[in-house]
């Protein structure tokens, strides 16, 4: 199916959802990863993201994924910015992967990783985003506390560097629980305290925790540093509830922390299509936010 035909069939098959009123407790954004399969199959591309979010789902906030972009050139960013202006959408953050290991044991390598993120700071500022999401990954696989502390020292140097670059542009640098030691909330909190900069924070993801970790307690630990929230969802019951995560319970954790900014839908399920999953997630968040 060609891209235009796909978009037309989508509009016919999935009625557009209403936009969320602005006086609610939080605002809903959409993580571009939710449509990564459609982009990967070339049914749509990154430039379609603003229109799909706004017209199909009534969502204003956009959470971009750098790996889904054609190229981070000035011309490409200008095209994307125009699409956003045309649809009345707003950049929230850019999820950045593949730019190097911020916790690498070789200082030259980790400083190169920090430098690699600078272009995304510039692009985030151009698109009106408040943050770039980075990773605290390393070439080391630390097991004991002393080894973890060493990796945290490496990460702290890298994040101090990129946060210093990002501060004049008023861009935050945020860490998601995204595999490795970042899936341990206590380790992430240690890094937050070690860097201790106002534009360094967390992006708590409702998923991405090992089975042995209590996800609700983990998110509670990350929320004091949160500059965004990722509503990971996998599947929904006939009643519209998420089947893996108790979302009302999780959103109580978020609300109790005093958070009232963007909550990004990130659908990663297989049973529903990407667009059906996003719509189900939007309906659930709207119900909670009513």
Each language-model region and where it sits:
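Conserved beta-strand positions in the central sheet of alpha/beta enzyme cores
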Residues: 61-63, 93, 133, 230, ...
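Active-site acidic/histidine proton-transfer and metal-coordination neighborhood
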Residues: 10-27, 51, 83-96, 100-204, ...
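Histidine-acidic metal/acid-base catalytic patches
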Residues: 2-58, 182-290
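Glycine-rich, proline-tolerant flexible connector loops at the mouths of alpha/beta enzymes
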Residues: 63-80, 139-142
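Metal-dependent catalytic neighborhoods of phosphoester/phosphodiester hydrolases
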Residues: 72-78, 110, 274-277
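Short acidic/polar active-site loop segments enriched in Thr and Asp
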Residues: 60, 90, 130, 260-261
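Residues that line or immediately flank small-molecule/substrate-binding pockets and catalytic motifs
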Residues: 32, 66-69, 98, 136, ...
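Catalytic-core regions built around general acid/base machinery
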Residues: 76-86, 162, 218, 250-253
């Amino acid at each position: 199916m060609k891209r235009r035909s796909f978009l037309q069939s989508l509009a016919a098959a999935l009625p557009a959802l209403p936009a969320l009123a602005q006086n609610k407790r939080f605002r809903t954004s959409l993580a571009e990863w939710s449509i990564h399969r459609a982009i990967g199959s070339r049914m749509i591309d990154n430039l379609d993201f603003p229109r799909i979010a706004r017209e199909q789902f009534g969502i204003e906030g956009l959470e971009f994924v750098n790996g889904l972009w054609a190229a981070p050139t000035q011309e490409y960013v200008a095209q994307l910015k125009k699409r956003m202006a045309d649809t009345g959408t707003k950049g929230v953050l850019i999820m950045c992967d593949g730019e190097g290991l911020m916790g690498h044991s070789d200082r030259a390598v980790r400083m190169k990783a920090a430098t690699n993120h600078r272009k995304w700071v510039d692009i985030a500022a151009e698109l009106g985003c408040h943050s770039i999401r980075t990773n605290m990954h390393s070439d080391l696989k630390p097991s004991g506390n002393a080894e973890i502390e060493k990796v945290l020292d490496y990460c702290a140097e890298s994040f101090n560097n990129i946060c210093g670059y990002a501060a004049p542009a008023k861009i935050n640098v945020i860490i998601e629980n995204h595999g490795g030691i970042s899936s341990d909330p206590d380790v992430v909190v240690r890094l937050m305290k070690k860097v201790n900069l106002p534009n360094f924070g967390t992006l708590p993801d409702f998923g991405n925790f090992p089975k042995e970790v209590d996800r609700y307690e983990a998110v509670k630990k990350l929320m004091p540093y949160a500059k965004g929230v990722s509503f990971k969802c996998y599947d929904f019951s006939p009643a519209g509830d998420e089947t893996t995560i108790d979302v009302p319970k999780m959103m109580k954790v978020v609300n109790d922390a005093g958070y009232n900014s963007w909550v990004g839908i990130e659908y990663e399920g297989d049973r529903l299509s990407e667009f059906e999953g996003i719509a189900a997630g939007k309906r659930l968040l709207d119900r909670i936010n009513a």
